Swiss-Prot record:
Belongs to the RNA polymerase beta' chain family. It catalyses: RNA(n) + a ribonucleoside 5'-triphosphate = RNA(n+1) + diphosphate. The keyword Nucleotidyltransferase applies. InterPro entries: DNA-dir_RpoC_beta_prime, RNA_pol_Rpb1_5, RPO1C. CDD domains: RNAP_A. The gene is rpo1C. It comes from Saccharolobus solfataricus (strain ATCC 35092 / DSM 1617 / JCM 11322 / P2). It is found in: Cytoplasm. Its EC number is 2.7.7.6. DNA-dependent RNA polymerase (RNAP) catalyzes the transcription of DNA into RNA using the four ribonucleoside triphosphates as substrates. Forms part of the jaw domain. Disulfide bonds: none annotated. This is DNA-directed RNA polymerase subunit Rpo1C. GO terms for molecular function: DNA binding; DNA-directed RNA polymerase activity. GO terms for biological process: DNA-templated transcription.
């Protein structure tokens, strides 16, 4: 708090600081001073704003700074300290998640499918407080084929039939009934056939027009690969307690499919598949997930990297409107400079292709100027000096 007589002084100081500091920082400083329990004097107001301006000014990037190489070094150097392991996720035996350097490489390489795709699915109010309802949603999500609920299969050559022994425990675990299995088989175009069910959950599938054992084996494989329920790509869905609500963790990812399931909070669904985010939500969302995923990987390893380096990497990867990898098939391979492309990888190919097209080197970037020994246009090299000689 401050004395009433010092309020005009504070307002004047706020006005002056607004010319230098972002408005949010100025507002935060003002609220901090007004909400303090002790009285803040004019000298202390001066010290607060002077220190904020000093720290902010030191944090600014100087004109001409080589921000690209600084960002590369700032992320690459901590990357050498990362572990190369795949970790179990939160102590759950069924789920693994790639962390450390392998995950960082996946992100900057913009891989279409991560090595361990997974989703964190939040539920709507109706489902998130009740474990049974959350389990109901999880069972809708989990992709289940007939082979997942079968303990054994056999073929009766005499009657030309396929025998499926269903596993009652797996049926219960997956939330599937024998009728669900029969309906899934019924949807297949298998010709003329009949299903007989015995008391021990055994299905005997008799075919009328099959006279080849090879055809029978093919039909068996087709039946075992038949979908009963779920979203393609979601191999496993596990309900977990987080705070006062239940969430679902999945092994596998299918963002567009999951969003259509009743009970899923579409505003809170998370996936580590950057390409899916780009396809479903667009390039801005993809940029955001790149920033979040890189930050998470570094934080999990206990590494502190300035967010601006990560922002720059994400901006470069997404600036064309699509997610591009940082490599010869993406950002580096699409540089305008022939020498810059050749300096990275497959040198001869780039030079031959450029010669065949008649490309011209403009020498506007850093790499190409270093190659031929020209001064680079960074730092003091950005300035063109002229000298007026003193005539005597």
């Amino acid at each position: 708090m401050i004395d009433e007589k010092d309020k005009p002084y504070l307002e004047e100081k706020v006005k002056q600081a607004s010319n230098i500091l972002p408005q949010k920082i100025v507002d935060d400083l003002k609220n901090l001073i007004l909400n303090k329990e002790i009285i803040v004097t004019r000298d202390e107001i001066d010290k607060i704003f002077d220190l904020a301006i000093k720290e902010y000014s030191e944090g600014l990037i100087a004109p001409g700074e080589a921000i690209g190489i600084v960002a590369a070094q700032s992320v690459g150097e901590p990357g050498t300290q990362m572990t190369l392991r795949t970790f179990h996720f939160a102590g759950i035996r069924e789920l693994n998640v790639t962390l450390g350097l392998p995950r960082l490489i996946e992100i900057v390489d913009a891989k279409k499918v991560p090595s361990t795709p997974m989703m964190t699915i939040y539920l709507t109010d109706e489902y998130k407080r009740d474990r049974d309802k959350a389990l109901e949603v999880a069972r809708k999500l989990e992709y289940t084929k007939i082979e997942n609920v079968v303990s054994s299969t056999s073929i009766d050559i005499a009657s030309m039939s396929i025998i499926l022994q269903l596993d009652n425990e797996m049926l219960k675990d997956k939330g599937v009934t024998v009728d669900d299995v029969k309906k899934a088989i019924g949807r297949l175009k298998l010709g003329d056939f009949m299903i007989e069910e015995s008391e021990d959950s055994t299905l005997n599938i008799n075919f009328a027009n099959i006279d080849s054992i090879a055809a029978l084996f093919k039909l068996r494989d087709k039946i075992l690969n038949t979908k009963i329920k779920g979203i393609k790509g979601i191999k496993r869905a596990i309900v977990q307690k987080k705070g006062d609500e239940y969430i679902i963790l999945t092994d596998g990812s299918n963002l567009s499919g999951v969003l259509s399931v009743k009970g899923v909070d579409v505003a809170k669904v998370e996936t580590n598949n950057i390409r899916e985010i780009e396809e479903v939500f667009g390039i801005e969302a993809a940029r955001e997930i790149i920033i979040r995923e890189i930050s998470k990987v570094l934080a999990e390893q206990g590494l502190d990297v300035d967010i601006r380096h990560i922002l720059l990497i994400a901006d470069v990867m997404t600036r064309t409107g699509i997610v591009r990898q940082i490599g010869r098939h993406g950002v580096t391979g699409e540089k305008n400079s022939v020498l810059a492309r050749a300096a990275f990888e497959v040198t001869v190919k780039h030079l031959l292709d450029a010669a065949a097209r008649g490309d011209v080197e403009e020498f506007k970037g850093v790499v190409e100027n270093i190659i031929i020994g020209h001064p680079i246009k960074l730092g003091t090299g950005m300035v063109e000096l002229t000298m007026r000689p003193i005539l005597r």
